[in-house]
């Protein structure tokens, strides 16, 4: 890195924002950030006003969390949850829509809303849980992707190990080794 930037000392990224991304659109002031981290709060405000055309990431998958002690604590985001209810849940025929509030689905909703603010649109690219590809509850999510985007490209890496027998064999094993039984998509 240092040879590429031709310097021996660390050069911090000027606009870095240390924040909970979903919290940035919850329309409430964070007094703690304003008081103790004013430079970071200013960077967050600046980022919120900037046009964003590309969002890339690997959002966490956490809908099955049992308690606050789990590694993937579920947090409530009133505005974001409302947007999911107005879009993905409203378009779904499924009775149980709980999986639409998984963090990776929230990331899609947040990103879709964020690039919609840009008059020329944009690109969202995630490595995510692939259950949305054929899950019953995610029907509304798929409908909204079709409505909100001009093109959708998906690489289904498969890997669903929550199946058994021939179906499990066809999934081709675990994508990330022994730690994950979840199907993955890009």
Kindly give the residue locations of the regions a language model identified:
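Conserved S-adenosyl-L-methionine
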Residues: 1-28, 71-73, 141
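Short alpha-helical segments and helix-capping/turn motifs at coil-helix boundaries
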Residues: 1-3, 37-43, 111, 137-140, ...
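C-terminal, active-site-flanking charged/polar segments
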Residues: 1-9, 144-151, 176-186
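Short, glycine/acidic-rich hinge or "gate" loops at secondary-structure transitions
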Residues: 7-11, 120-126
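Extended catalytic-interface subdomain
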Residues: 15-16, 50-60, 180-186
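SAM-dependent methyltransferase catalytic-core segment centered on the flexible catalytic loop
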Residues: 22-124, 131-135, 148-154
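GTPase G-domain guanine-specificity segment
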Residues: 134, 141-144
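Class I S-adenosyl-L-methionine
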Residues: 152-185
């Amino acid at each position: 890195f240092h040879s590429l930037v031709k310097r021996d000392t660390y050069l911090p990224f000027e606009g870095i924002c240390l924040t909970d991304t979903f919290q940035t659109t919850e329309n409430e002031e964070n007094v703690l950030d304003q008081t103790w981290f004013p430079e970071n709060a200013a960077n967050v405000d600046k980022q919120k006003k900037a046009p964003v055309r590309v969002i890339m990431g690997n959002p966490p998958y956490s809908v099955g969390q049992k308690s606050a002690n789990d590694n993937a604590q579920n947090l409530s985001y009133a505005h974001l949850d409302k947007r999911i209810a107005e879009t993905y849940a409203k378009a779904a025929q499924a009775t149980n829509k709980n999986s639409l509030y998984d963090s990776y689905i929230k990331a899609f909703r947040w990103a879709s809303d964020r690039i919609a603010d840009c008059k020329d649109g944009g690109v969202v690219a995630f490595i995510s849980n692939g259950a949305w590809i054929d899950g019953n509850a995610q029907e509304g999510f798929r409908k909204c992707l079709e409505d909100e985007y001009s093109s959708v490209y998906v690489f289904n890496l498969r890997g669903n190990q929550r199946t058994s027998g021939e179906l499990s064999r066809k999934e081709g094993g675990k994508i990330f080794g022994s730690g994950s039984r979840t199907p993955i998509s890009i």
